[in-house]
Amino acid sequence: MTPALFDGIELLVDLPAYQLRAGTLGAVVHVHSDATYEVEFTNEEGETTALCPLAAEQFLVVWQAETRSWLPLAEHIAALVTHLPEDAGREVLDFARFLHERRQRQHTTSSTQSGT
């Protein structure tokens, strides 16, 4: 997804020079012509704590200004996984399968116990 003005983003990398860690939320406040984005980070009072030029590979869009909606969870996960190395992506897939299988077993067990 191409970032747009006022989209909400989540950092994928630490930015020690700005004292920002991966996972920090910010907002695109300017789109530069060279495919970099000026991203503003604020504190709880809405005061700017950092203004950083970032490449799109350094963050994920998590809130779309145009639609005024959060990125659906499945899309958020998929976008994050695409930034992982192949082996880490396979670990995520294995974990998702584990969770799915566990949920299926719980559903089967509760259905059996309730007599349905």
Would you name each region that the model predicts?
Residues 47-48, 54-61, 78-93:
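C-terminal structural segments of small proteins and small subunits
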Residues 1-15, 86-87, 94, 100, ...:
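Mixed-charge, Lys/Arg-rich low-complexity intrinsically disordered regions
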Residues 12, 32, 40-42, 60, ...:
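Compositionally biased, intrinsically disordered low-complexity segments enriched
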Residues 62-72:
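Intrinsically disordered, low-complexity linker and terminal regions at domain boundaries
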Residues 70-79, 87-116:
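Short amphipathic alpha-helical interaction elements located at domain edges
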Residues 3-58:
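Basic/aromatic-rich interaction segments and small domains that mediate binding to polyanionic partners
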